[in-house]
Amino acid sequence: MSTTFSNTLLSDILRQVRPLIGQGKVANYIPALAEVPADNLAIAICTIDGQIFHAGDAEKRFSIQSISKILSLTLAMTRYQEQEIWQRVGQEPSGQPFNSLVQLELEKGKPRNPFVNAGALIVCDMLQSRLSAPKQRMLEVVRKLAGCPDICYDSKVARSEMEHSHRNAAIAYLMKSFGNFDNDVLAVLQTYFHYCALKMNCIELAKCFIYLANQGSTIGSEQQILSPRQARQINALMMTCGMYDGSGEFAFRIGMPGKSGVGGGIVCVVPGEFTVTVWSPELDRSGNSLAGCAALELLADRVGRSVF
């Protein structure tokens, strides 16, 4: 399986997509993210037999942003029964911007899925109810999954997001008005923004999410993080909802479950085989990494891998 991968292959893919740098836009509504140099470019693969391949700036850490929504949902799945989660947040694509209030108002405060901001805030609200120290618990989980004890939050990014949190606060208060929010809004926002401000590199992310390619189990230690059913559910949500309102196009072009963040990172899963992560800070119109999507499309074509 892993014989199709090599560092040379990944370097060649980055060489082909590098001319796209300059055609997208770095996220600027969070000032700390706007300062990230646009020419960063990286890719990394982790196979279920433990091999790592990488190229470019794969050891440079960045703010994972909405990629963290997979981790918060994973944590919630270990603390709640299935029906408890899905009665508060849906499983459908939204077709709306990730921070939309309109759909939330029409649907009486129940977010479409856990990967839009409203849905992720519900998940964080649920974690706030069950964990005494949700920020510390997330660090423990991520450090263990990635095998890196020094992974931490970028306090500058978290602070910058909190200072520009008006829309997310409005989303939370709207859900609270419909009775779908239990805890103090500011406390939940603090947790949510810290999760978004996790700093990881592509290699760490590829290793971190290998449990989604391995029926919910880590490799090496073989620790069962989720049941095979739960891992399947997250992969399905990534395929249908993971790339904002560009999820359909991403499935069409690349054919892998994926989750992006406005920091320019994307993580993808091919169940039973591997995880792949890319990073390029410039985004397309849907808020997904422009060069990153192109690199994933090239990879899918070159190695003939997708879930279809």
From Swiss-Prot:
<dbReference type="GO" id="GO:0004359">
    <property type="term" value="F:glutaminase activity"/>
</dbReference>
<feature type="binding site">
    <location>
        <position position="244"/>
    </location>
    <ligand>
        <name>substrate</name>
    </ligand>
</feature>
<feature type="binding site">
    <location>
        <position position="192"/>
    </location>
    <ligand>
        <name>substrate</name>
    </ligand>
</feature>
<keyword id="KW-0378">Hydrolase</keyword>
<protein>
    <recommendedName>
        <fullName>Glutaminase</fullName>
        <ecNumber>3.5.1.2</ecNumber>
    </recommendedName>
</protein>
<feature type="binding site">
    <location>
        <position position="117"/>
    </location>
    <ligand>
        <name>substrate</name>
    </ligand>
</feature>
<dbReference type="GO" id="GO:0006537">
    <property type="term" value="P:glutamate biosynthetic process"/>
</dbReference>
<dbReference type="InterPro" id="IPR015868">
    <property type="entry name" value="Glutaminase"/>
</dbReference>
<feature type="binding site">
    <location>
        <position position="168"/>
    </location>
    <ligand>
        <name>substrate</name>
    </ligand>
</feature>
<comment type="subunit">
    <text>Homotetramer.</text>
</comment>
<comment type="similarity">
    <text>Belongs to the glutaminase family.</text>
</comment>
<dbReference type="Pfam" id="PF04960">
    <property type="entry name" value="Glutaminase"/>
</dbReference>
<feature type="binding site">
    <location>
        <position position="161"/>
    </location>
    <ligand>
        <name>substrate</name>
    </ligand>
</feature>
<dbReference type="InterPro" id="IPR012338">
    <property type="entry name" value="Beta-lactam/transpept-like"/>
</dbReference>
<feature type="binding site">
    <location>
        <position position="66"/>
    </location>
    <ligand>
        <name>substrate</name>
    </ligand>
</feature>
<feature type="binding site">
    <location>
        <position position="262"/>
    </location>
    <ligand>
        <name>substrate</name>
    </ligand>
</feature>
<dbReference type="GO" id="GO:0006543">
    <property type="term" value="P:glutamine catabolic process"/>
</dbReference>
